Amino acid sequence: MLIPRQQAPDLSVDTLGAGRFRLIDEKPERMTLVCFYRGLHCPICASYLKELERLTPAFAERGVATIAISSDDEARARAMADAQLGRADLVGHGLSLADAGKWGLYISASRGKTSIGIDEPALFSEPGLFLIRPDNTVYYLSVQSMPFVRPNFAEMVQALDFVIKNDYPARGEQLLEQPAA
C-alpha cells in the first residue's frame, strides 16, 4: 500500500509527443502530478483531462509538472488526445496492469460498450491522482474504484498555494494495525 512520504513505484511509459516518460528522471521545481485515467472509452475521463489540460499552466506556475496516463495502447491514447486535447505531450500510454497495481489502482473488467459507444478494454485501471516530489516520494494520493467523484483540479491549484506558502508536509503517513478478525 502506498502512503505519503514513501518512495513512489517505478513509472515508465511512452508518451504521444514527448518520448519516454520516466518518473524518476522528472525534476520539477516542486512536484509531478500523475493523473491515471481509465482510457478512451470513458467520457468522464475526457472532460477530466480537458480540465487538467486547461489548468496545466497554473500547475506549471507553481512548479508542478503534469502527465495523464492510461493502460490504453498508443492508438487509443492518440484517439483520446486528438478528440479531446490540444497537447499530445500530456498523454502517456501503455501502463501495464502490473504497474497499475503497484500504484494501488483498482482494475476493472470490461462490460462491453460504454455510454459513448466505445468498447472497454478486457481489463483496465480505474482513476488515481498523485503528487510526487522531485525526490520521488509520494506527497498526495487519491485512488478511485469508480469513474465518478474525482479530485477537483481547480481546488488542487488553490491547495498548492497553501502548501507552498506554509511549507505544508505530506499527511496521512501513519497506518494503524488492523485488529485480527
PLM regions and their residue ranges:
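Chalcogenol-based redox active-site neighborhoods
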Residues: 1-181
